[in-house]
């Protein structure tokens, strides 16, 4: 402990200064993902490096999170933390715009809550640094959840300049550190089964938050509430739960040094290894932990905010994760035993999430990989696994995004199946399943979004929503995603765009999936993923749960991503946002707030990868109905997103749709309408782009909304639409899509009731937008099968995308032929009148022969050309008696040859003199 303490103090000093750099340590979230059940979701916003390196910083930052309700920078950092818990979410949300009443009300909710707030305020870290996920987790962990599971709305910590924690806090941290270390060591020994310790296995989720850099990070996410004595969800750990999950490939082993520092109300995350810190150093907000917690956070997560300390190397996708998590609200932690099985995939997802920015695509791939593993796990575990899967996806994604794309399709399928299996499955497995696709799209997109949002507004992973909680608790820990996504924390309005993104992930299983992608607020992945996941959750779980989680994720994403991919997010917004409001209208509002602030950050993420955001898939729509109720809140964000994403319309389209979705959920129909307009504009922009690349449009048929959305919006970027569209529900969705398009209500096929009101004005535009940007180009191939799409494409820009070209082109050709013959060609009568046809006769045959002979005698070889004439059209020598035609220019050709030429061109083939210009010389 002393060693750790010393190291932590040393590293903390360094980390405090290099919060951003430390962000990269989030990669440990891969392992963290293993604890999918643990609702602890770290957002990509959280930087693993920051988390680890910021052990002290984390602690301080936790205070900050509490004290900085409206600090964009803090929001970014806290964004990841928020995902871990409502408290985190509030602190995390801390997005400037997102101040939550709960934050203020809940400071006293739990003992740690107040100290935490105070310490957070004392610290006041700049969120822009994107505090490490761990730190975020530490700061706004469960204590809030335990007390009230603060909604996103409650203000997070205000930025506090002081980054030093009081002596008392330090002592507490040391005690907690020792305690956690013991627990961690114990669990470390139990690595294989550590996942089973259901103590808020946020470690996996935290792992997700950890940066996706290659570094292995250990996320220690001690719940300050744990210190308060809140019973651990899964109990073996008293105040703090230290879950060290070792994936098949333990990440921590290499970096065994695990420094966990936490004060009673604050948790400090100590970098497990230098690598981890470097990750944190990266300073890229990660939404990984959001992913991780998504699955991991089951109903428990929903019902409780938890402070988690996750010690987990992010670098290695599969790594032990030390999850110190306590849900103040829900002492019981969903066991992550099954999740443990999923630990590696989760780790990957975590990594993926952390890499969301840079490894968005990878994320998808990893997710895809993780997904396969998840299916094996039992339903209950599925939630955890889903979380793990997300984490895993993140991790894998960090390693390679490409795989995600293939996974994406599989994810979609799983989406469909998982949705059916059980809430837990839906939230967990489907999330994982869908997560990869979203991860894939969104990773690019999401990655960008996340990146974008983070810079401007660190993602606030813990964006739990108490509302979400309700939905989240639907059936088993629909977990991971649902419980963690739906966590009150998730709904932190403060979670800025990024925060919201993460929140979405955390809020519900659906969102959880989305979160991984959605970590990048603007990232289509984020939104997209959330969408996909949300759809599953909504579909199979309770729409409420899915919607709740989804909404959070969507909303969270919407805020940050809109700028990145306004259209995409918008599209998603309809789907995602709508579900979100159900449980989190405030969240929606936060999105709006976030949207306002995030627009600047999102622009950076024009992530073609986001294309894969296909995850937006109509799944989002499923939750939409619930979302619609709360949608009115975020009208502003849509515009921001749209404007921000306007430029990278294609990529942003998906993200934008998602974002839009989120916003819409937050925003009301008004926002939806606004989005619709924005979307239409963007669609037009995209369309123009697409017009430039008509072939692509033809290449990409939009089989279903999934494809039509992020991917399709991004279509020209990723073009994984085929793969993605190969999702099992592609067929059904496609029909739904067609119906929606035909009816003009994009959401109609996917949801009914309120959604229509909100979505009708907005949704159709997003869809149209997608169609135009991604779908039109994509749809051109099968446009014949989708007349409504064709109409949309033609209606959007006032002309048919395909028909006009076809008809006009043919007409032009015919016209050219007609005009060409008249203008350029000559009639047979004109030819006969202007030329001199006759039988060829070698006039100078004798002379030529004599000359030839003479030349030979002189030893000079006379060229035959001099003695013989050739038809320059057929290049044959003119023979005696052949029908030839002499033109006014005196050039001689075979009649057959020259007549064919003159029919198309009245000019001499040799000198280009018009036969009409001179009188024929018939002599």
From Swiss-Prot:
Q: Where is this region: Ubiquitin binding?
A: 836-838, 886-890
Low complexity compositional bias: what residue ranges? Answer: 77-96, 193-212
Q: Where is this motif: SUMO interaction motif 1 (SIM)?
A: 241-245
Per the record, the zinc finger regions (RING-type) lie at 871-912
Among the GO biological process terms of this entry, one is:
DNA repair
Give me the reactions it catalyses. S-ubiquitinyl-[E2 ubiquitin-conjugating enzyme]-L-cysteine + [acceptor protein]-L-lysine = [E2 ubiquitin-conjugating enzyme]-L-cysteine + N(6)-ubiquitinyl-[acceptor protein]-L-lysine
What GO CC terms are in its UniProt record? Answer: cytoplasm; nucleus; PML body
Q: Which InterPro entries match?
A: RNF111_N, Znf_RING, Znf_RING/FYVE/PHD, ZNRF3_Arkadia_E3_ligases
Q: Which Gene3D superfamilies match?
A: Zinc/RING finger domain, C3HC4 (zinc finger) (3.30.40.10)
Q: Give the Polar residues compositional bias ranges.
A: 15-31, 107-121, 289-298, 338-363, 584-596
Q: Name one GO molecular function term.
A: SMAD binding
Write out the residue ranges of the motif SUMO interaction motif 2 (SIM): 266-272
Catalytic class of the enzyme: transferase
Q: What is its EC number?
A: 2.3.2.27
Which proteins does it associate with, and in what oligomeric form?
A: Monomer.
Q: What does this protein do?
A: E3 ubiquitin-protein ligase required for mesoderm patterning during embryonic development by enhancing signaling of the subset of TGF-beta factors responsible for the formation of dorso-anterior tissues of Spemann's organizer. Acts as an enhancer of the transcriptional responses of the smad2/smad3 effectors, which are activated downstream of BMP. Acts by mediating ubiquitination and degradation of SMAD inhibitors such as smad7, inducing their proteasomal degradation and thereby enhancing the transcriptional activity of TGF-beta and BMP.
UniProt family annotation: Belongs to the Arkadia family.
Task: Specify the protein name.
Answer: E3 ubiquitin-protein ligase arkadia-A
UniProt organism field: Xenopus laevis (African clawed frog)
């Amino acid at each position: 402990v002393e060693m750790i303490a010393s190291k932590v103090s040393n590293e903390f000093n360094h980390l405090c200064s290099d919060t951003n750099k430390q962000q990269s340590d989030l990669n440990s979230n891969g392992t963290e993902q293993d604890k999918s059940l643990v609702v602890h979701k770290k957002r990509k916003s959280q930087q693993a490096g920051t988390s680890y390196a910021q052990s002290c910083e984390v602690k301080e930052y936790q205070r900050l999170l509490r004290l900085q309700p409206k600090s964009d920078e803090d929001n970014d950092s806290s964004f990841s933390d928020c995902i871990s818990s409502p408290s985190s979410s509030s602190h995390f949300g801390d997005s400037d715009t997102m101040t939550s009443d709960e934050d203020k009300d809940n400071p006293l909710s739990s003992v740690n809550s107040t100290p935490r707030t105070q310490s957070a305020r004392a610290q006041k870290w700049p969120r822009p640094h994107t505090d490490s996920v761990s730190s975020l987790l530490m700061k706004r962990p469960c204590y809030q959840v335990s007390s009230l599971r603060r909604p996103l709305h409650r203000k997070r910590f205000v930025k506090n300049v002081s980054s030093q924690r009081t002596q008392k806090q330090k002592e507490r941290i040391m005690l907690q550190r020792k305690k956690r270390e013991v627990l961690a060591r114990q669990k470390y020994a139990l690595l294989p089964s550590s996942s089973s310790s259901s103590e808020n296995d946020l470690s996996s989720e935290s792992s997700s938050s950890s940066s996706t850099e290659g570094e292995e990070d250990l996320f220690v996410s001690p719940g300050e509430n744990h210190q308060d004595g809140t019973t651990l969800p899964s109990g073996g750990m008293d105040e703090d739960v230290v879950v060290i999950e070792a994936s098949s490939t333990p990440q921590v082993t290499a970096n065994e040094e695990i420094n966990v520092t936490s004060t009673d109300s604050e948790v400090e995350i100590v970098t497990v290894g230098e690598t981890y810190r470097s990750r944190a150093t990266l300073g890229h907000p990660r939404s990984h932990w959001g992913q991780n917690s998504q699955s991991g956070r089951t109903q428990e997560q929903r019902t409780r905010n938890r402070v988690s300390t996750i010690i987990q190397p992010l670098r290695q996708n599969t790594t032990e994760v030390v999850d110190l998590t306590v849900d103040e609200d829900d002492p019981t932690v969903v066991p992550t035993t099954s999740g443990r099985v999923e630990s590696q995939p989760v780790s990957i997802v975590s990594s993926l999430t952390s890499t969301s920015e840079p490894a968005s695509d990878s994320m998808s791939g990893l997710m895809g990989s993780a997904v396969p593993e998840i299916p094996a796990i039992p339903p209950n575990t599925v939630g955890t696994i889903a979380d793990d899967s997300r984490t895993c996806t993140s991790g894998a994604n960090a390693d390679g995004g490409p795989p995600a794309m293939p996974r994406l399709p599989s994810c979609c399928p799983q989406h469909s199946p998982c949705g059916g299996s059980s809430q837990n499955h839906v939230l967990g497995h489907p999330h994982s399943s869908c997560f990869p696709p979203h991860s894939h799209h969104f990773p690019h997109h999401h990655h960008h979004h996340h990146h974008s949002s983070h810079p401007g507004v660190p993602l606030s992973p813990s964006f739990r929503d108490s509302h979400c909680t309700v939905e989240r608790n639907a059936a088993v820990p629909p977990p991971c995603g649902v419980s963690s996504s739906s966590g009150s924390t998730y709904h932190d309005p403060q979670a800025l765009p990024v925060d919201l993104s993460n929140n979405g992930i955390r809020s519900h299983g659906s969102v959880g999936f989305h979160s991984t992608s959605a970590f990048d607020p603007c990232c289509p992945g984020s939104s997209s993923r959330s969408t996909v996941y949300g759809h599953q959750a909504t579909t199979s779980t309770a729409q409420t749960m899915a919607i709740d989680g989804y909404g959070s994720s969507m909303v969270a994403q919407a805020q940050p991503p809109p700028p990145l991919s306004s259209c995409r997010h918008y599209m998603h917004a309809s789907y995602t946002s709508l579900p979100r409001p159900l449980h989190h209208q405030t969240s929606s509002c936060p999105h709006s707030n976030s949207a306002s602030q995030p627009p600047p950050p999102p622009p950076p993420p024009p992530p073609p990868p986001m294309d894969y955001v296909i995850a937006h898939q109509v799944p989002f729509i499923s939750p939409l109905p619930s979302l619609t109720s709360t949608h009115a809140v975020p009208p502003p964000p849509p515009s921001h997103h749209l404007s921000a994403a306007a430029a990278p319309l294609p990529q942003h389209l998906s993200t934008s749709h998602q974002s839009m979705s989120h916003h819409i959920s937050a925003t009301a129909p008004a926002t939806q309408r606004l989005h619709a307009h924005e979307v239409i504009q963007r669609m037009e922009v995209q369309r123009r782009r697409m017009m430039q690349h008509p072939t692509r449009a033809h290449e990409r048929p939009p089989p279903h909304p999934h494809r039509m959305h992020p991917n399709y919006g991004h279509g020209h970027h990723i073009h994984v639409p085929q793969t993605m569209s190969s999702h099992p529900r592609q067929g059904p969705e496609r029909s739904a899509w067609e119906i929606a398009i035909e009816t003009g209500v994009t959401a109609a096929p996917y949801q009914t009731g309120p959604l229509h009101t909100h979505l009708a004005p907005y949704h159709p535009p997003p869809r149209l937008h997608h169609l135009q940007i991604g779908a039109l180009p994509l749809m051109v191939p099968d446009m014949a099968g989708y007349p409504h799409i064709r109409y949309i494409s033609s209606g959007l820009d006032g002309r048919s995308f395909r028909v006009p070209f076809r008809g006009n082109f043919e007409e032009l050709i015919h016209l050219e032929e007609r005009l060409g013959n008249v203008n350029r060609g000559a009639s047979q009568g004109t030819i006969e009148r202007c030329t001199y046809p006759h039988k060829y006769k070698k006039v100078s045959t004798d002379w030529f022969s004599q000359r030839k002979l003479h030349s030979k005698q002189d030893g000079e070889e006379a060229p035959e050309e001099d003695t013989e004439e050739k038809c320059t059209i057929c290049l044959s020598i003119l023979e005696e008696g052949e029908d030839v035609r002499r033109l006014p220019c005196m050039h001689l050709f075979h009649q057959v040859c020259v007549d064919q030429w003159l029919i198309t061109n009245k000019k001499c083939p040799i000198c280009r003199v018009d036969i009409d210009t001179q009188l024929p010389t018939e002599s």
